[in-house]
């Protein structure tokens, strides 16, 4: 529709007392990209409607609350401010007028009038007062108010045109605008309640939640620190145990493994164990004592290593000569074994004569001089032939006596 025609209809509605319909027509005119002259006419009509609202504010308790909140003055200051040639600012003023009218009509017939203070307090975001809105605030208000209203407004205009010109067109246009105002107020009420809860009632709850999280995190951290301390103590115990084991193993075996009798890290293991045991808190004398013990153990392990080395060398030499010596040992063993058997047989058959000389034959008989007498002649087949002898042998001693046997 033509902008001039929309402005003309708005003037007609205002003169007839249809202020809501006048606001709807001015809104359509401001959205139709008006020129400067048209914007000036729109601005003049906005101020006239604002004056009417101020003259018809709600009475009773609402009026007292409105005056206490300063809603009237802030409302008029906002609508009387210069729009500075911005159609978006004018749309913000028209949105404010539509919100006041919709809010007041929803309160019922018992309280006829416009509740300006409540709307201004709602828009300013403070429950105890209201503030004037500048050009930028009005532009933001228009953007929020009409963000989903272009289609709804077009539908309202279409419905009004379908019902016919005159009453149908005007009625349909403000219905869509009132719907936008209701949605806008509901969204602002929810936002305000959320802000009040965040800044008021739930502020301590937020602090309590933060404190609970903080204490819980500290408890976990302290528990983790305690656990880490326990693990560290256990780890230190394992390190000390490993140091002691390394001392014994490396120190004990170091001399054996080194060809020159060196300790193979025994002293370093002792020093590491001493350092773990001291923990940086013992005196230097204790450190020197551990160093002296380490040196003594080192010398001991070196001596053991040398002894073991000499022992190994002796075993190797013995094994090197084992081939020649084993032959001698075998011969000696055989010799000793044969002699042992011979002595057993020889000694078992001997009969001692009077001079103690052994007889060389088990069948030999000794004479008076102890000379062995052979029991017979040996023939070619190895048999002895004996002879019989009867008689006595006599011997004369130095005294001339003759002894007979």
From Swiss-Prot:
Position(s), cross-link Glycyl lysine isopeptide (Lys-Gly) (interchain with G-Cter in ubiquitin): 5, 84
Function: Transferable epigenetic modifier which forms a prion responsible for the non-Mendelian trait [PIN+]. The native function of the soluble protein is unknown.
One Gene Ontology cellular component: nucleus
Domain comment in the entry: The prion domain (PrD) is a Gln/Asn (Q/N)-rich domain, which is unstructured in its native, soluble form, and which forms a parallel in-register beta-sheet in its amyloid form.
One GO MF term attached to the UniProt entry: identical protein binding
Protein name per the record: [PIN+] prion protein RNQ1
UniProt-reported outcome of changing residue 387 to L: In strain: SCI4
Additional record remark: [PIN+], also known as [RNQ+], is the prion form of RNQ1. [PIN+] is the result of a conformational change of the cellular RNQ1 protein that becomes self-propagating and infectious. This conformational change generates a form of RNQ1 that assembles into amyloid fibrils. [PIN+] promotes de novo [PSI+] formation upon SUP35 overproduction (cross-seeding). [PIN+] can be cured by GdnHCl and by deletion of the molecular chaperone HSP104, which is required for [PIN+] propagation. Present with 1140 molecules/cell in log phase SD medium.
Gene: RNQ1
Keywords: Amyloid, Cytoplasm, Isopeptide bond, Nucleus, Phosphoprotein, Prion, Ubl conjugation
Region of interest called Disordered, as start-end residue ranges on this chain: 149-172, 185-405
């Amino acid at each position: 529709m033509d902008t001039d025609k929309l402005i003309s209809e708005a003037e007609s509605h205002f003169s007839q007392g249809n202020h809501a319909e006048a606001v709807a027509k001015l809104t359509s005119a401001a959205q139709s990209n008006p020129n400067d002259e048209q914007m000036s006419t729109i601005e003049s009509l906005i101020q006239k409607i604002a004056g009417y609202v101020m003259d018809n504010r709600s009475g009773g308790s609402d009026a007292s609350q409105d005056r206490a909140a300063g809603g009237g003055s802030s409302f008029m200051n906002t609508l009387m401010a210069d729009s500075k040639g911005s159609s978006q600012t004018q749309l913000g003023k028209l949105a404010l007028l539509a919100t006041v009218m919709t809010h007041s009509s929803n309160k019922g017939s018992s309280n006829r009038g416009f509740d300006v203070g409540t709307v201004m307090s709602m828009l300013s975001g403070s429950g105890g007062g209201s503030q004037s809105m500048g050009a930028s605030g009005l532009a933001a208000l228009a953007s929020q108010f009409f963000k989903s209203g272009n289609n709804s407004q077009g539908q309202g205009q279409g419905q009004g045109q379908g019902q016919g010109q005159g009453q149908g067109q005007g009625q349909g246009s403000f219905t869509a605008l009132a719907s936008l105002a209701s949605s806008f107020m509901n969204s602002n009420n929810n936002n305000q309640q959320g802000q009040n809860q965040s800044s008021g009632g739930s502020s301590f709850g937020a602090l309590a939640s933060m404190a609970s999280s903080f204490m819980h995190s500290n408890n976990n951290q302290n528990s983790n620190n305690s656990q880490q301390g326990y693990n560290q103590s256990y780890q230190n115990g394992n390190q000390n145990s490993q140091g002691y084991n390394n001392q014994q193993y490396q120190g004990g075996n170091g001399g054996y493994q080194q060809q020159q009798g060196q300790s193979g890290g025994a002293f370093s293991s002792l020093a590491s164990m001493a350092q773990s045991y001291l923990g940086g808190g013992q005196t230097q004398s204790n450190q020197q004592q551990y160093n002296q013990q380490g040196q003594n153990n080192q010398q001991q392990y070196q001596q053991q290593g040398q002894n073991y080395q000499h022992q190994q060398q002796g075993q190797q030499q013995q094994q090197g000569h084992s081939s020649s010596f084993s032959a001698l040992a075998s011969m000696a063993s055989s010799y000793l074994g044969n002699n042992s058997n011979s002595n057993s047989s020889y000694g078992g058959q001997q009969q001692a004569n009077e001079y103690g000389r052994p007889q060389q034959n088990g069948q030999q008989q000794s004479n008076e001089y102890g000379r062995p007498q052979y029991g017979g002649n040996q023939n070619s087949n190895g048999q002895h032939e004996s002879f019989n002898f009867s008689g006595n042998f006599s011997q004369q001693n130095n005294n001339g006596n003759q002894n007979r046997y």
